[in-house]
């Protein structure tokens, strides 16, 4: 069990004051989007190195149909985790209708980012990338978590979803790490954003999707679901779900 870390930021008040018209512009002078600088060496990376970053507004890109999770026992586990983490977070999270759970025990080719509706019990699942530092061989499986700056790895634990901002990949969502294993999220620029290297066709063809630098990267269409249903003071939890 991770402990929540008090970072001394009243994020709830900040979000309440700043979330107007459903979107927030970036704070000036602060760019938290990722920049891919490492040389591309694998066959997969060479094939998709030239993929253009989408310039279309997120709202104009249609999401792929979410993939439901049919395993009743797994569904119950997700709901139990969502309830547990909401209870652990308490007043730090001020929108508890939907909880995002990223299950990094699954391959990146599988829809493993689960949006749990706490009111209806409906669970919708999407593709999400993990960090390249968590998967150096790029075989599609997360090997380790890290909270260390420069690791380019995914961090486990509970996050508070914050405001929207404009970055390299367009509209993105800031994240505040609330655990001892992810408290560097803001400093590491760990965010949620769309990316051209996350796509169902890539997963089907290669058995994996691309890697981020630690961010929760989604396909452009799926990311619309995150913008409207997971941002603005909700809970995101990342771990290996057994």
Segments from the language model and where they lie:
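N-terminal secretory signal peptides and thylakoid transit peptides that target proteins
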Residues: 2-22
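Boundary at the C-terminal end of the N-terminal hydrophobic targeting segment
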Residues: 31-33
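Glycine-rich, aromatic-bearing surface loops/beta-hairpins
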Residues: 35-37
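Cell wall/extracellular polymer interaction/catalysis modules
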Residues: 39-212, 220-224, 228
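Short cysteine clusters
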Residues: 215
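A short beta-strand-loop micro-motif that forms or neighbors metal/cofactor-
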Residues: 229-242
């Amino acid at each position: 069990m991770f402990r929540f870390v008090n970072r001394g930021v009243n994020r709830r008040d900040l979000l309440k004051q700043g979330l107007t018209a459903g979107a927030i512009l970036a704070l000036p002078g602060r760019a938290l989007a990722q920049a891919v600088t490492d040389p591309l060496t694998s066959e997969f990376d060479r094939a998709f190195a030239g993929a253009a970053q989408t310039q279309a507004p997120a709202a104009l890109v249609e999401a792929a149909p979410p993939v439901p999770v049919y395993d009743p026992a797994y569904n119950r586990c997700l709901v139990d985790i969502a309830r547990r983490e909401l209870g652990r977070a308490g007043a730090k999270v001020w929108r508890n209708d939907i909880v995002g759970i990223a299950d990094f025990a699954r391959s990146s080719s599988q829809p493993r980012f689960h949006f749990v509706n706490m009111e209806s019990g409906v669970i919708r699942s999407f593709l999400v990338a993990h960090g390249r530092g968590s998967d150096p061989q790029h075989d599609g499986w997360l090997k380790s978590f890290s909270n260390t700056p420069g690791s380019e790895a995914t961090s486990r634990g509970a996050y508070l979803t914050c405001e929207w901002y404009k970055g390299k990949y367009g509209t993105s969502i800031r994240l505040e790490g609330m655990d001892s294993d992810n408290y560097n999220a803001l400093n590491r620029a760990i965010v949620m954003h769309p990316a051209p290297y996350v796509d169902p066709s890539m997963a089907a063809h290669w058995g994996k999707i691309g890697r981020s630098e630690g961010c929760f990267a989604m396909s452009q269409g799926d990311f619309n679901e995150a913008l409207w249903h997971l941002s603005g003071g909700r809970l995101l939890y990342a771990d290996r779900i057994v």
